[in-house]
UniProtKB/Swiss-Prot annotation:
GO terms for biological process: arginine catabolic process to glutamate; arginine catabolic process to succinate. Pathway: Amino-acid degradation; L-arginine degradation via AST pathway; L-glutamate and succinate from L-arginine: step 1/5. One of its GO terms (molecular function) is arginine N-succinyltransferase activity. Keywords: Acyltransferase, Arginine metabolism, Transferase. The keyword 4Fe-4S does not apply. It comes from Shigella sonnei (strain Ss046). The gene is astA. It comes from the Bacteria. InterPro entries: Acyl_CoA_acyltransferase (IPR016181), Arg_succinylTrfase_AstA/AruG (IPR007041), Arginine_N-succinylTrfase (IPR017650). Belongs to the arginine N-succinyltransferase family. This is Arginine N-succinyltransferase.
Amino acid sequence: MMVIRPVERSDVSALMQLASKTGGGLTSLPANEATLSARIERAIKTWQGELPKSEQGYVFVLEDSETGTVAGICAIEVAVGLNDPWYNYRVGTLVHASKELNVYNALPTLFLSNDHTGSSELCTLFLDPDWRKEGNGYLLSKSRFMFMAAFRDKFNDKVVAEMRGVIDEHGYSPFWQSLGKRFFSMDFSRVDFLCGTGQKAFIAELMPKHPIYTHFLSQEAQDVIGQVHPQTAPARAVLEKEGFRYRNYIDIFDGGPTLECDIDRVRAIRKSRLVEVAEGQPAQGDFPACLVANENYHHFRVVLARTDPATERLILTAAQLDALKCHAGDRVRLVRLCAEEKTA
């Protein structure tokens, strides 16, 4: 059975293995053991209440409960940009016009922005390619919403998610090549590694401070503004079905889109509810997959179960209860895994 749980110190080697499979561009999961160990420590201290809000971040892993194999990772940053500035480009417009010459040009322009400062962030989502089956990707991504719903007071009103931009298998980023490299004088893989290992001071020092007309970029770079890496397209679709939208903010390095949503408008948060759980044999039938989570802050767990999402009393097997660290009579959080498709 696949279970979501908080990260532990012993997971570091498994996270190193996952990091080696990302193919680059996942800044927050570098193949660097010291950085990953520090990330785990920060998550543990967050759960223990030892960090200020500006440093808090939760990390979860997807584990096969039978073998102990760690198949994926996901994380939530509580409030971005309160220590180090959190940069985006806002894709806007500048108009240049002359009535006398009968010229009017509305030019797409990139403006350096810190507009998402203080937002909570969904980040570090990666599922081992060998485990991309049977709803594991949905479970990994959406489990975070169950945690946010259960512990709403820990998070801010807006949630953002940076989507990985277009990068090829050799680490070539058209957006970086045409823009960032001119200011930073280093390859994309190098800047990606520096950010992932926490060395971010250079961003503020070297970033272009003035608006940039996108027409000055190569056509290849213009074409990838707000576009996602092919492997990231499913993750984008998942978030958009939960209510997230692209509001013309992009990543400063690869040009990938930043999606955002008010936390209380996220479908899985808004529609999740508490039900009593009982032990038994679940009813047979054509039921949809649902997310089921306990309400235990320090021992949080999420699993998938096929059940009636409208039930008031959820019947789970002994194995499911054990995976959730629950007992009969406890209250668990329940929501349909995917939004119901509207029928005409």
